Amino acid sequence: MITKVILDFETSGLNPYHDDIIEIAMKVMDSDKQFTTLIKPKSNECISDEITSLTGITNEMLGKKGQFWGEAYQSMNEWLHSVRGDNDKIVIISHNGESFDFIFLRRILNDLNKILGCQNIFPIHKIIFIDTLLLAKRLLPRRYSYKQFSLCKFFNINTEGCHRAMNDVIALEKLYFNLENKLDNELDKRRKVSQNPEMVFDYIKLK
């Protein structure tokens, strides 16, 4: 079975091409395998009071507990290799990933390429990217909001502690499980969507 990883970043702002990652959380779906770390901003700039209010992450926390970005990225890279195992590909699931988290992830892998060389970084062409925001828009048309918090509320999923990366990951794991089940019912396939993530990717891309 292909490994499915739930991903969330907390960042210093909303620009995925410029802002800093300040927290990474990843979790293998239906498993206790997880990776999380705080990261000192790569730009060496302090995070704003607005970001602290939203996430609960302070500059003091980053200074005391945050890893330097190169160390954090390498640790994440090693963890991805370890959970991929013998599988040819890996699925990475995030909410609003296409416009945000997946862009940050590509930046991480690009930065790692400069440090480690292409032979050691996790191969991006082996990743199947699934954006639960796009999936929800296909499965639940005409909703007033597709924010993760709103969708979790729709499925009665606990969102306590939201806007810390691992808490968001745990909630998103449950949200994706519900969306998978809904897609199973809609497609009425003998082959379960949970065992064939390519079907989810193809469904999202259908016009």
Label the model's feature ranges.
Residues 173-207:
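Acidic two-metal-ion nuclease catalytic site recognized across multiple nuclease folds
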Residues 107-112, 138, 154, 175-182:
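Active-site catalytic microenvironments for nucleophilic, acid-base chemistry
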Residues 71, 171-172:
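Short Asp/Glu-rich motifs
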Residues 1-110, 145-146, 150-163:
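Conserved non-catalytic scaffold segment of RNase H-like nuclease domains
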Residues 100-128:
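Substrate-recognition/cap helix-loop segment adjacent to the acidic, metal-dependent catalytic center
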Residues 167:
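Acidic donor-binding loop at a coil-to-helix junction in glycosyltransferase catalytic cores
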Residues 128-143:
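Short alpha-helix plus adjacent loop in nuclease-associated cores
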